[in-house]
């Protein structure tokens, strides 16, 4: 029995039928992103028939032959960079092409002289995405100053705002980024506030989708980061790098690729450590060491025209949580967190002639996060942050009834105590494990007028958790549960597992209505259930989406888009009984499990316009959200869980310019204005809403203005120079020292205000050495802007990194 939203039952029944069909795959949610590589081959201005076309990339070698019109088509091509070789009696050609979701269409003139280089394909703007979609190839990823850091790479995307400890907020959303790796999404069921879901050193190609999402995409909508991982071609060989720099940082990577039978194997290992892993609450960075160990394997096996791809990634990260000495935390506090992630996917692709493909396969993820508290010092720190009297935690209840089946009855709050989330000190020891399995099936068929796609996905999640939240000595629970020691600390344990199931079906079509118009339309159905020992509930939604595009030649277009989105809440949360027990002074009954999925209506217009040799993309979006999802903190601990606001509004306007430079270089610039507000906190599970105003309030991740720009210039000797710049107007703050821009219609009313405006630059120079090696010199935050990433914010106080240097040596940069 489900507690609400029973109107989703018909959809759920249909989706469960599909889940049985897919059960034999026993894998995880997947959304295969493949494209079409096509082109026309000529010689002496005449079409060339029978030319042999070979495309090598993504661990694959794909082949085709031109027809009588000189045209070739390779369907079902994974996104990535490809070396294309064309051979015919009339001549040959060799070029390198980046293939993104919209595909690539080449026009190649054969020559008797072989010319090798990278082509910058000029084709109509991406028709399936938004005005600010972009791709990052291997050169952009490895030669950017942000290389090696996923947050630093993401912050260069249009509409990105820097949050604390590696969190990145894109397009006004809290952080709901959808990562898809080699066709399979990475589940994100644990509430992770530090660290990254995937190691950036294992990425060879990124397609970043920013909006106008077709029906195949679901769950998270700040941005879709479609990743093609490490791949190899040619003779077996090594690749690697070694970097050392500020704060004792050491970062080393060693990779190797080889052929095994008809297949290609790529393996890589990364080890990283240093003394500044997170953004500390104080100007300096005490107790802030970190480490990261990552192992990666990819094996791709062609079987005739088909291929099978296996991807395995494992990481183990450790973090010391920085101490807030200025806020009263003892300098010798030793709070730590570890994160362990194993992700594997197996994808099978079958081309259907030259006009379609079928993809399916399983994936699996196991994530474990452990928190290790320091009770004595945690209590000292928490007591220092209590705004009331030292005895308020002990005196928070005037009386209570007997304990019945573990439930404290009839709690009566003490009216003389102004109890809040910081009245008591907490210490957390936590161990949470999420296991995700499921299956997928995706089909696409291309014709002259239509590109039809449909598919189904299923995932099952089991979250096992053990929370031990200990209240300070002198608390309101010990006299009730342990009356013999009324002044002792008391621990509230929560070991209730959560089990969730998500099923989705989608169908979408691209209708090419002549040369000037195109209609993309589709519908997606989502069904989501979650149950535990104390609750069971389920939800569903049908989400129509449509995008109409008008083309003005090959490089100019405008579009209008409407879509409905459905975002499930995280499957990690505090149980109702534990939430009630921790909040007895605020609750009179056991907390209800009242979390809801977020439901959005999205309106978007945009386009692409030729500007010189480059492309100017424009995107204007309005999102109206019901039951907007945010998160809240459990005391002063690293334990977070989702909450809902009754309404949310996000408006963003972005202009993004990009142009290719010589030798695969690039220049880009993005300017974004964002407005993100929410209203009416409605979640009582952790009592975060008592005393919170009900009017529109800027979200804690609301940054009104951001501007990013960057350049990668490659020289003739194989070296390069890269520079990135970022300006942000600052995130929301409850305080306003210095009269920094505040909220309100005119930007001058009282808080939440904005702290702190910042302008930073990072630069890297690569010097080519003999044998494909390179020496790298990098400076981050060149002008040493020591700004607050967050200040008096729901995310706490966090300082940005200072100026930092590193020097490195790379092996096999070609």
Predicted segment positions?
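Extracytoplasmic beta-strand/coil segments of soluble accessory domains associated
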Residues: 149-186, 204
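Conserved C-terminal beta-signal and adjacent last beta-strands/turns
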Residues: 16, 301-304, 337, 698-814
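Short acidic/polar hinge/loop motifs at secondary-structure boundaries
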Residues: 184-210
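Gram-negative outer-membrane beta-barrel transporters
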Residues: 513-514, 620-626, 641-737, 783
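Short, acidic, small-residue-rich periplasmic hinge/interaction motif at the N-terminus
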Residues: 40-46, 52-58, 87-90, 100-143, ...
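Membrane-embedded beta-barrel scaffold of Gram-negative outer-membrane proteins
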Residues: 359-363, 367-371, 551, 559, ...
């Amino acid at each position: 029995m489900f507690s609400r939203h029973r109107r989703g039952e018909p959809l759920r029944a249909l989706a469960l039928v599909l889940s049985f069909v897919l059960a034999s795959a026993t894998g995880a949610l997947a959304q295969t992103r493949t494209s079409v590589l096509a082109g026309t081959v000529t010689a002496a201005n005449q079409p060339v028939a029978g030319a042999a076309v070979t495309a090598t990339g993504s661990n694959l070698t794909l082949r085709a032959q031109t027809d009588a019109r000189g045209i070739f088509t390779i369907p079902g091509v994974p996104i990535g960079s490809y070396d294309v070789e064309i051979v015919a009696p009339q001549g040959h050609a060799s070029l390198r092409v980046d293939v993104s979701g919209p595909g690539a269409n080449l026009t190649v003139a054969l020559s008797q002289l072989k010319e090798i280089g990278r082509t910058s394909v000029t084709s109509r703007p991406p028709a399936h995405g938004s005005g600010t979609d972009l791709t990052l190839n291997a050169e952009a990823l490895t030669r950017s100053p942000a290389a090696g850091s996923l947050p630093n790479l993401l912050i260069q995307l249009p509409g990105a705002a820097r949050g604390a400890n590696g969190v990145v907020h894109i397009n006004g959303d809290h952080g709901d980024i959808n990562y898809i790796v080699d066709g399979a999404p990475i589940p994100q069921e644990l509430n992770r506030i530090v660290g990254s879901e995937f190691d950036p050193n294992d990425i060879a190609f990124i397609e970043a989708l920013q909006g106008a999402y077709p029906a195949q995409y679901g769950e998270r909508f700040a941005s879709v980061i479609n990743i093609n991982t490490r791949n190899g071609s040619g003779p077996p060989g090594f690749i690697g790098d070694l970097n050392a720099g500020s704060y004792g940082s050491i970062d080393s990577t060693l990779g190797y690729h080889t052929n095994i039978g008809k297949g290609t194997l790529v393996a890589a290992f990364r080890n990283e450590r240093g003394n500044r892993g997170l953004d500390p609450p104080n100007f300096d960075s005490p107790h802030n060491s970190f480490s990261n160990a990552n192992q990666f394997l990819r094996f791709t096996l062609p079987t005739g025209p088909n291929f099978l791809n296996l991807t395995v990634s494992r990481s183990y990260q450790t973090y010391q949580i920085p101490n807030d000495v200025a806020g009263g935390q003892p300098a010798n506090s030793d709070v730590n967190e570890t994160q362990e992630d194993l992700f594997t996917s197996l994808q099978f692709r079958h081309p259907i002639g030259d006009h379609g493909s079928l993809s399916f396969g399983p994936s699996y993820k196991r994530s474990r996060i452990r928190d290790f508290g320091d009770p004595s010092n945690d209590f000292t720190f928490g007591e220092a942050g209590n705004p009331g009297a030292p005895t308020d935690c002990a005196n928070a209840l005037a009386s209570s009834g007997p304990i019945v089946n573990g439930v404290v009855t009839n709690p009566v709050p003490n009216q003389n105590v102004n109890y809040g989330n910081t009245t008591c000190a907490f210490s957390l020891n936590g161990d949470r494990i999420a296991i995700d399995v499921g299956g997928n099936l995706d089909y696409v068929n291309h014709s002259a007028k239509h590109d039809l796609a449909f598919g189904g996905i299923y995932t099952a999640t089991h979250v096992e958790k053990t929370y031990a939240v200990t209240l300070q000595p002198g608390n309101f629970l010990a006299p009730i549960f342990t009356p013999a020691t009324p002044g002792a600390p008391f621990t509230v344990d929560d070991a209730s597992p959560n089990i969730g199931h998500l099923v989705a079906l989608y169908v979408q079509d691209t209708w090419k209505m002549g040369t000037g118009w195109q209609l993309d339309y589709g519908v997606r159905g989502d069904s989501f259930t979650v149950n535990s020992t104390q609750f069971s509930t389920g939800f569903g939604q049908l989400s129509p989406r449509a995008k109409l595009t008008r083309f003005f030649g090959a490089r100019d277009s405008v579009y209008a888009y409407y879509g409905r989105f459905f975002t499930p809440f995280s499957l990690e949360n505090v149980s109702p009984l534990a939430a009630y027990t921790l909040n007895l002074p605020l609750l009179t009954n056991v907390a209800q499990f009242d979390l809801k999925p977020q439901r959005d209506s999205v309106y978007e217009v945009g386009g692409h316009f030729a500007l010189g040799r480059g492309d100017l993309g424009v995107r204007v979006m309005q999102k109206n959200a019901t039951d907007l999802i945010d998160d809240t903190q459990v005391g002063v601990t690293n334990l977070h869980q989702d909450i809902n606001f009754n309404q949310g509004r996000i408006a963003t306007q972005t202009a993004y310019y990009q142009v290719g430079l010589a030798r695969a270089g690039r220049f880009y610039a993005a300017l974004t204005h964002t407005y993100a507000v929410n209203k009416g906190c409605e979640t009582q599970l952790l009592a975060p809403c008592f005393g919170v105003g009900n009017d529109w309030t800027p979200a804690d991740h609301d940054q009104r203005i951001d501007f990013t720009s960057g350049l990668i210039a490659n020289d003739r000797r194989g070296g390069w120079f890269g520079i990135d710049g970022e300006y942000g107007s600052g995130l929301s703050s409850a305080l306003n020292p210095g009269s920094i821009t505040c909220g309100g219609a005119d930007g001058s009313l009282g808080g939440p205000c904005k702290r702190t405006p910042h302008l930073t630059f990072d630069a890297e120079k690569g010097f080519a050495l003999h044998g494909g090696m390179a020496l790298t010199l990098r400076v981050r935050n060149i002008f040493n802007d020591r700004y607050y990433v967050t200040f008096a914010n729901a995310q706490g106080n966090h300082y940005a990194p200072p100026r930092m240097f590193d020097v490195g040596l790379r092996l096999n940069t070609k």
